[in-house]
């Protein structure tokens, strides 16, 4: 259990628009991906994206859809993406400075845990990643459906072979689909906007689940991603519904992984663990999106969600979310060396 004191959250509510009816501009990275990977010409992209988004939002009024959040490609902006992840996932010969666990690329897979629409997966494939070794898992199967509508690639990237949904990060059962397909096989695990949904103890449990997914063959594995952090680490109370969520800074992130390794020492022979993070300046729009997504996922804003589902007009604004003092966007990594 964390011994960090609860953090205070004295900020007043801040208006937050769940649904943005118009897409002002297609971000350049996703525009290139849609044109060259999905075969959707630039002049048709905005209408295609809007049509897919609006159809999905009617059934699934998530802020990541309503605010075009799914068009961002977080993995490709991670500091290890170009230097390590792409080279290790490419079809070329393994990087000169060594491969991930097992010594050979055929021995392990890449998993995006909490993959949303699978946008980061498609970007990795487009950048040269070996699609046969790339998997995605998400709690919500509907996100996988929307991803295929957006990228039109089910013929070349079959759902049954590459996606696991629903996937519960707290299900350790060997009978689960996630366990059957991925336990003991993952050399690189990416998970963005998942850890920060939970309190300290739940995050420790999720980290233990991640260890169960990783390959323990002789060599190094990587867990990486992004999440909401805070310059003052601690438990932040939920506005509604009770409970708390833990916000990390770099020190607390390292501390948590040290605890996980100690807790799991009887199961795994871990030679070393090196956890790190970079904290980025406060992006209020981005952080509000993450807060809203959390509350919607946890049933804290069902009334707002229902209104968003029924409406969606330009004139009608729906607001949720509260900005926490000290918030930052945190990019993290965990290197684990199994003996």
Predicted features along the sequence, with ranges:
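A short SAM/SAH-binding and catalytic strip from SAM-dependent methyltransferases
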Residues: 184-202
